[in-house]
């Protein structure tokens, strides 16, 4: 069976629409992670700026990131079980998020290494997330997310040229807003609008 160009274009558009709908349904997770990262960054900045137990300023990250991981992990496990039951395929783009997340987890070992350079941790954490966001935004053709992803890449690379000092955790919060919060809100509002239409 041969497909006509119009049929193949329609098929491609349907696949993109289905993936976009999946991200709209999961817009909550983008918002959820952005809030966790923003809270962690703000807590660390306040503790460093006020000199309130600065040695333990990592505590927000140490509590909120594992909490977010377990909540996401178990909800994705339930979703995977439901997809297997309904014989749906999993989105291969989810593996990109997983790989970026594993890179972020590995960066928590940097303070215990000989580098002790938090700018390297910023690059290890946010460059993969920025490029994954950009790849998915380009794939889904979401122009706002493309712009915020490019801004995230530029800001992440800026740690090589500017010394942020104790404001580095605030940069994490800004990057979380650009990479996760802005597209998450856009996806979530689109999803709510579609549910009200149906």
Where are these regions (language model features)?
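N-terminal juxtamembrane cytosolic/stromal segments of multi-pass membrane proteins
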Residues: 1-26
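C-terminal ends of transmembrane helices
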Residues: 71-88, 131-138, 182-188
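Membrane-proximal helix-loop-helix units in multi-pass membrane proteins
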Residues: 91-149
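Selected alpha-helical membrane-embedding segments in polytopic membrane proteins
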Residues: 21-109
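Structural signature of hydrophobic alpha-helical transmembrane segments
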Residues: 57-67, 113-127, 174
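Membrane-water interface of alpha-helical transmembrane segments
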Residues: 20-30, 51-55, 116-123, 142, ...
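Membrane-embedded alpha-helical transmembrane segments of multi-pass integral membrane proteins
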Residues: 36-43, 67, 106, 129-132, ...
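Terminal transmembrane helical module of multi-pass membrane proteins
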Residues: 132-198
